[in-house]
Amino acid sequence: MAIERTFSILKPDATARNLTGAINALIEKAGLRIVAQKRIRMTREQAETFYAVHKARPFFGELVDFMISGPVVVQVLEGENAVLKHREIMGATDPSKAADGTIRKLHATSVGENSVHGSDATETAAVEIAQFFSGNEIVG
């Protein structure tokens, strides 16, 4: 099994409800290490760049507005098959369809306010990590 890194964001709905510790506990229980973490307020430009892949979708503006509505926690996670493992513990985008015990089943309030983002591939993770962290901020 390969040791990988993936990128995670605890979204404004999660930080507003002080869920950082609870979500981090689920991440660590799944065997992933948090090797970088910081609480930030995304700028509109950062959010638009980060979600540029969705620019043509009807929900893009609402997504950007949500992501800049409050603080987020950006993270780099490390572990065996980190991308897949993190996606499994996040659960389905729609919390009503998420498996029991997943972050979204436990904490998300809707499809839009689903508490967490996770990279979908190692290549995507590398790009997303570089958008928010410099090399010396990642201590693995």
UniProtKB/Swiss-Prot annotation:
It comes from the Bacteria. Its EC number is 2.7.4.6. Its main location: cytoplasm. GO terms for biological process: CTP biosynthetic process; GTP biosynthetic process; UTP biosynthetic process. ATP binds at residues 11, 59, 87, 93, 104, 114. SMART domains: NDK. It holds the Pfam family NDK. It is found in: Cytoplasm. It catalyses: a 2'-deoxyribonucleoside 5'-diphosphate + ATP = a 2'-deoxyribonucleoside 5'-triphosphate + ADP; a ribonucleoside 5'-diphosphate + ATP = a ribonucleoside 5'-triphosphate + ADP. The active site is at residue 117. Keywords: ATP-binding, Cytoplasm, Kinase, Magnesium, Metal-binding, Nucleotide metabolism, Nucleotide-binding, Phosphoprotein, Transferase. InterPro entries: NDK-like_dom, NDK-like_dom_sf, Nucleoside_diP_kinase. One of its GO terms (molecular function) is nucleoside diphosphate kinase activity. Homotetramer. This is Nucleoside diphosphate kinase. The lineage of its organism: Bacteria, Pseudomonadati, Pseudomonadota, Alphaproteobacteria, Hyphomicrobiales.
